[in-house]
């Protein structure tokens, strides 16, 4: 049996539970045709570079598959039929990667606070506390030092 990495994009308007159900459905197709599904990763809802079938975002999912080619072809056939799947890609690999994929490592990196490891910034502009403003010259605003204009009804 050959080894594959399979990624598919599901519509933005379905829930995460429905994405998990799609993964389980396609996992069942692979197992019914004599294959095995290893690692499954749900990368979550991400923005697309361009619109696909009027969607600006999509749920991404990755599956590591060890199955005969016929099983993968059947899964891809069912994905073509499904309205919930926007795109899919299957790649034959020599061996499956151990540990989390690059996308999951990136997500872990993005969860950390952003300070750049250098601590708070000194000088410059930005979020520094400038303290209270000094009082304005001449009271509140500019209008106190001007004489009032006469109104036509007051004359």
Curated annotation (Swiss-Prot):
UniProt keyword list: Ribonucleoprotein, Ribosomal protein, RNA-binding, rRNA-binding
One GO CC term on file: cytosolic small ribosomal subunit
Classification via SUPFAM superfamilies: Ribosomal protein S6
Pfam family name, one: Ribosomal_S6
Annotated segments matching region Disordered: 94-155
A Gene Ontology biological process term: translation
One Gene Ontology molecular-function label: small ribosomal subunit rRNA binding
Superkingdom classification of source: Bacteria
Entry similarity comment: Belongs to the bacterial ribosomal protein bS6 family.
Function recorded in the entry: Binds together with bS18 to 16S ribosomal RNA.
Family matches, as NCBIfam families: S6 (TIGR00166)
Name of the protein described by the UniProt record: Small ribosomal subunit protein bS6
Lineage, opening ranks: Bacteria, Pseudomonadati, Pseudomonadota, Alphaproteobacteria, Hyphomicrobiales
Gene giving rise to this polypeptide: rpsF
